Amino acid sequence: QNLKYSYIVIDCRPTLGTLTINALFACNFIIVPCEMGRYALDGFADLMETIDNVQNNDNRPKEKFIRILLTKYDARNKVSNEWVMNQLEGYRNLLFETMIRRNEAINQAHMAQEPISVFKPDSSGAQDYEQLSREFLRLCQQ
């Protein structure tokens, strides 16, 4: 059966192994998830450098093919949120407007092996991912 897809998502581990490198070569849009915490940024610069090296033949501006998705956002963590945003200062133009808020329903959905939109569609996590989907589709149509 020959299926046609508008979008294919390749979800890679947060390592720079063979699968990730191959996915970077094959893709035409990259979403880089970044947790709102100190340790999440440790490998961030390496990943961005690898993306630059892999995508160096692409003449499009970065804003056209890469976006950083901030996850596990908690508005109560003002100091750490500010610190993370300061660290990402050079990448502000690559940030999705949507942030995925910290939400226990997302963890529970992972354990249940169900999408958050099925597991708990009224949760803030489901709302955030729905908003992300709309933003992503808008970017793809530009």
Task: List each language-model region with its residue ranges.
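Short, hydrophobic alpha-helical segments
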Residues: 136-142
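Short aromatic-enriched loop/helix-cap "lid" or pocket-rim segments at secondary-structure transitions
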Residues: 79-82, 108-112
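C-terminal boundary of histidine-terminating zinc-finger modules
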Residues: 109-131
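Hydrophobic residues within well-ordered, non-membrane alpha-helices that form the packing/core
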Residues: 51, 133-136
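Active-site donor-binding loop signature of nucleotide-sugar glycosyltransferases
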Residues: 98, 102, 121
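Short, glycine-rich, amphipathic interfacial segments at transmembrane boundaries or analogous
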Residues: 102-108
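Conserved catalytic-core segment of NTP-binding enzymes
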Residues: 2-97
